[in-house]
Regions:
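Short glycine-rich catalytic loops that host catalytic nucleophiles or stabilize transition states
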Residues: 277-283
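Loop/turn elements at helix/coil->beta-strand transitions in domains of secreted/extracellular proteins
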Residues: 20-23, 245-247, 272-275
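A catalytic-pocket lid/entrance helix-loop region that shapes and gates access to the active site
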Residues: 13-78, 128-159
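Short beta-strand/loop motif that positions the catalytic acidic residue
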Residues: 243-244, 249-252, 256
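Alpha/beta-hydrolase fold active-site neighborhood
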Residues: 80-242
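Glycine-rich nucleophile elbow surrounding the catalytic serine of serine-hydrolase chemistry
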Residues: 3-13
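Conserved alpha/beta-hydrolase "acid-adjacent" motif
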Residues: 257-262
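Catalytic histidine-centered segment of alpha/beta-hydrolase-like enzymes
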Residues: 283-293
Length: 293
């Protein structure tokens, strides 16, 4: 069995329910199953999993890698200042990059998170795209943007970035509710009070500016959701299924913006035959999905 992200949670549960059906497991960039189900825990799901902290750390690592590359990363001299400038400007105004699109704070953060998540999974360097976008937005903010050039499909800031923002269509909204929100709300224990999201979001935003509000809001739809497992007595934890008895391998990237580097070590402890491998120069969410190996 191979599972990535939430698929790894499914694999961890399945292996405990039906151990005779599996020879081995590979769990790639797994969410922590204990935190995912969260039986009896007072915080919302994404506060328990911690992607706000991991996302900020990955962005910091990206800036450091660019600076370490020197002249090989054309944005190295100004990238941190550019980012801070963009964040500050977006507090009060919308920024438009000619040939690319218009960004408010929410659209920009969605694009940042999406680029860190994907890495190079779409056949181009998402991180180079992101750095170029940050610099372009900073130029717009301070009025030094060059004259616009026609956008092309292979431009550094092009079609891929434009796809990262904007309101979802009705069909896409319904699809997300059925394939993401319904699963999350049915699986995870969530607090019954909506104030729990406000408090968790404020705390996460204070620790990881730009990422806290984004991530904690992702499961706020579960508050009041009729199928939500929001009663402690109805919540199931991964420990209720026993241990993983088959051999299993846990993979993680050192620069994973969703589960972090140390998630693999936690998941390895779910059974006596687990091993963890961390790719020290691995980026994005998913080791095998983005790997050329």
């Amino acid at each position: 069995y191979y599972g990535i992200s939430y698929g790894a949670v499914v694999g961890a549960v399945y292996s405990r329910l039906f151990p005779a059906h599996l020879r081995s497991l590979t769990l790639d960039s797994p969410d922590d199953p204990e935190a995912w189900f969260g039986a009896g825990r007072p915080d919302p799901l994404w506060a328990r999993l911690g992607p706000a902290e991991y996302g900020e750390a990955t962005l910091e690592d990206l800036f450091s890698a660019c600076e370490s590359a020197g002249s090989r990363c054309q944005w190295a001299p100004t990238i941190r200042a550019d980012y801070e400038h963009v964040i500050e400007a977006l507090r009060t105004e919308r920024l438009t990059v000619p040939g690319t699109g218009s960004f408010d704070a929410s659209a920009f953060q969605n694009t940042v998170v999406g680029a860190l998540y994907r890495f190079n999974q779409n056949g181009r360097d998402d991180y180079e795209t992101l750095l170029g976008l940050i610099h372009a937005l900073a130029q717009v903010a301070d009025g030094t943007a060059p004259d616009a050039e026609p956008a092309s499909d292979d431009s550094v800031i092009g079609q891929q970035t434009r796809a990262g923002f904007g309101a979802l269509s009705q069909d896409a909204t319904v699809s997300r509710m059925l394939t993401v929100d319904a699963v999350v709300c049915a699986d995870a224990h969530e607090p019954p009070q909506r104030e729990a999201w406000f408090m968790s979001a404020a705390a996460a935003e204070a620790d990881s500016p730009g990422f806290g509000y984004y991530w904690i809001s992702q499961d706020s739809i579960c508050n009041g959701w009729s199928a939500a497992g929001n009663r402690v007595e109805d919540s199931v934890g991964i420990s209720d299924y026993g241990t993983i008895d088959v051999p299993f391998l846990v993979l993680s990237n050192a620069h994973d913006p969703v589960v972090g580097e140390w998630g693999a070590d936690r998941v390895k402890g779910l059974g006596p035959r687990g091993e963890a491998v961390a790719v020290t120069d691995g980026w994005g969410h998913g080791v095998l999905r983005g790997s050329s190996c």
